[in-house]
A protein has these predicted regions:
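N-terminal Lys/Arg-rich, disordered targeting/topogenic segments
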Residues: 1-19
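N-terminal, polar/Ser/Thr-rich
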Residues: 17-18, 36, 57, 63-64, ...
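Hydrophobic alpha-helical transmembrane signal-anchor segments
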Residues: 19-46
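Soluble non-transmembrane domains of integral membrane proteins
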Residues: 53, 57, 64-65, 74, ...
Length: 304
């Protein structure tokens, strides 16, 4: 009998030890299981990141060959005037620049979109036909206090900026009153940004007329999005496209929109009071340019 009790007591000791360490064992087992589950999760996350990088590369490659997303700034007028200064008793003459933005900037655009494929990835691109109408006047220029007599109206530049000039499909011209001017590549140091086109024009008539109406058309390619800078005292944009999943972006949302399964139309109106810069910029700087860039708005052609 004593031997039986001793055997039972001996069996209780391992059982007690197991109970004491059972919680620790459970924690260790759970930790091992969690680690085993994390391994495929990390692998999946790495795969997602790699797919994301590959998609970005595919979009960049197609966009570089077709044309980048376009942001359009213009048209506007650059006027130059002589600036006389004295340095060490010597008189120096440099060139000052004044930018004059239009009183009205009305843009009507038709866009035809399509999807290009690069491997398993899709990139949205478009071809657009844009019509720009409006007018310039000297009203705001007179308010700015600049010396109109010093301005070289006979050598004014009509400036038009866009992001990627490869998207231009045909020659661009602008009609001012009854005169037509052809644009030249580059800005020749006359514009807000370095990328775009300009046309040298004799705008002496602007001093004589209260209004100088303009009209221009452009066929432009781009990818993913199109945006506009609201340079007009009143800017109105009307866009239509065969795209059913637009994402309206930028500093202003459209006042009216109509989106269906296959297309959309949208209208914006932006006043000069809605932005942080005036109709005239005298010897503009980086801060002025940043204000213009930050005021742009438009649409992103989102792939569903």
């Amino acid at each position: 009998m004593d031997n039986l009790n001793e055997n039972l007591n001996g069996m209780e000791k391992p059982a007690g030890c197991f109970r004491r360490f059972s919680k620790t064992i459970k924690v260790v087992v759970i930790a091992v299981l969690v680690l085993l589950l994390l391994i495929p999760m990390v692998m999946i996350e790495d795969m997602i990141r790699e797919r994301g990088r590959t998609q970005v590369d595919a979009i960049e490659e197609v966009s570089q060959k077709w044309s980048l997303a376009q942001t359009i700034t213009g048209p506007y007028i650059n006027l130059q005037y002589p600036v006389v200064s004295v340095d060490n008793g010597k008189q120096k003459v440099s060139i000052g620049n004044v930018l004059l933005f239009p009183d009205e900037l009305f843009i009507d655009g038709q866009l035809r979109t399509e999807i290009l494929k690069r491997g398993i990835y899709e990139v949205n691109v478009y071809q657009s036909e844009l019509v720009f109408k409006g007018s310039f006047s000297l009203e705001e220029l007179k308010k700015s206090g600049v010396d109109l007599d010093a301005m070289r109206f006979d050598r004014a530049a009509i400036c038009f900026n866009l992001t990627d000039m490869r998207g231009i499909n045909e020659q661009i011209s602008i009609m001012l009153n009854d005169s037509v001017y052809m644009f030249e590549p580059g800005m020749d140091g006359r514009g807000i940004k370095g990328t775009g086109v300009h046309a040298v024009a004799d705008l002496t008539a602007l001093k004589e007329n209260k209004k100088l109406p303009y009209e221009m058309k452009i066929k432009l390619k781009g990818s993913q999005s199109i945006n506009f800078s609201p340079l007009g005292k009143t800017t109105k944009v009307n866009l239509k496209a065969n795209w059913g999943t637009p994402s309206f972006t930028g500093n202003y949302l459209p006042d009216n929109r109509n989106v269906t399964e296959n297309d959309f139309s949208a209208q914006w109106q932006v006043l000069n009071l809605n932005r942080n810069y005036s109709q005239v910029m005298v010897d503009y700087n980086t801060s002025n340019i940043k204000d213009i860039e930050n005021s742009s708005f438009g649409v992103n052609f989102k792939i569903p």
